[in-house]
Amino acid sequence: MAISIQTLRSFVKVIALINESDSGKFTAFGLDDAFHVATIGYPDCLFSRDQAEGVLGEGFCDDIPTRDDSQEILRWHNLHNELDEIYETKAFLKKLKIELTVFDLKEIRGGEAIHDFNMPVLKRQHATFDIIYDGGALEHIFNAPQALQNMLLLCKVGGYIIHSNPLNIFNHGFYNFNP
């Protein structure tokens, strides 16, 4: 599960679309209220400082902490030869005025909302998120129709669901989603 530079660009575009539809004009990240984003699994920020600042502007990353376990995570993603460090995801997104809720089966990084997406989400969670991001979890959930329904139920009317699932990676998860 990751936020790639392409995903970061998608977040910026979706936030611009939501801002535009709410106010009639693009206001970038100057909102008073945070965007509420839910992810299925903990998303590691898998992009470099130069890539992030190419999208968000020079100096954006100056005060964002990096993870103490960056090298371990980079090895797990097989990116230890490409990136030097990983930004702390919640801190990075908070600077974009994104309030992150991570749904997962168990607490791994800390602060996850524990839920099995094979089962229906709670009614009190319906329509509470502006953006739902699946960066590579759906193919690992056995009951894919229920997981998709959960994502739809969690998303506010007018919100967005972003999927970034692997294509043609055999023996990766339960499913291999294709066009």
Model-identified regions with their sequence ranges:
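Generic preference for flexible, low-structure residues
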Residues: 53-56, 114-116, 148, 177
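N-terminal accessory regions of S-adenosyl-L-methionine
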Residues: 1-107, 179
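Short, intrinsically disordered, charge-balanced linker/junction segments flanking boundaries
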Residues: 172-179
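Conserved SAM-binding loop
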Residues: 29, 37-40, 72, 81-172
